[in-house]
Every structure is written in C-alpha cells, then in structure tokens.
Amino acid sequence: MAVCIAVIAKENYPLYIRSVPVQNELKFHYTVHTSLDVVEEKISAVGKAMADQRELYLGLLYPTEDYKVYGYVTNSKVKFVIVVDSSNTSLRDNEIRSMFRKLHNSFTDVMCNPFYNPGDTIQSKAFDSMVSAMMVQAS
C-alpha cells in the first residue's frame, strides 16, 4: 500500500519516517518536507472556516508522476504523511482514512508510554511493526 509513512512534529521536524525501498529514503524525505507547505495551507484554510469541527484528515495533498501524497493532522498539530504509489488505482479514500486512523491510534499508544519523551524520535517496536504492516513489500 504505502511506500513512505512519516510522523512530523508540531515544529515540523520528523519524529518518524520509514520508506521502502530504503534507497529512495532521501527522495521521500524531500517529498514529505515539501508536503508540509500544503498541510499548513490546508490547516489555515480549514481553521478559518470551522474551528470547532475541523476534519483531521486532509485528503490528497498533491499528486506527482509516481506518487500520491496524503495528509492528516492531530489536534496537537502533529502531522502524518502517507505516500502511496500512483499506479495503485484500487486504493480508495476510505482505505487511506483507515490507515491514518490506525497510525493515529498507534501514535497515541506511543505518547501514553511513560518512558517516551514527547518530541523525541519514535523508537517503538509496536509502532514500527504497525507501520511495516502498512508498507508495501519490496520485491
């Protein structure tokens, strides 16, 4: 499904980023970083419209020739970015939402860990295995 999953802190530095294949990691760092401008733009546009009923799922941030970049923002302004392969046309919007819900729930579990310092990079085996389940298997 996903080729890159990233968790970005409120201050826009990566808390977690994972991509397959590993050779493209720098390319995906760039893709995730450039998507943050679109995320900020959507947050400010939605914030002006309805501050109370803000949708956490931002939808498709932007498509590229090879990938589609989707975004999600938590109430604490932590951003999740999922990059999927454009050739995967069977992937529906509700499946992307489901992936973000799983990611958010797993992130909440990490935050509830008393040994995790908020703002540190995420180094949880449970979080990593959940992300691995969402990633496409490199063949």
UniProtKB/Swiss-Prot annotation:
Signal peptide: none
Subcellular location, principal: cytoplasm
Location within or outside the cell: Cytoplasm, Perinuclear region; Endoplasmic reticulum; Golgi apparatus
Pfam families membership: Sedlin_N
Any Gene Ontology CC annotation: Golgi apparatus
Keywords per UniProt: Cytoplasm, Endoplasmic reticulum, ER-Golgi transport, Golgi apparatus, Transport
Presence of keyword Transport: yes
Keyword Transport: yes
A Gene Ontology BP annotation from the UniProt entry: endoplasmic reticulum to Golgi vesicle-mediated transport
General function of this protein: May play a role in vesicular transport from endoplasmic reticulum to Golgi.
Family: Belongs to the TRAPP small subunits family. Sedlin subfamily.
Name the record gives this protein: Trafficking protein particle complex subunit 2-like protein
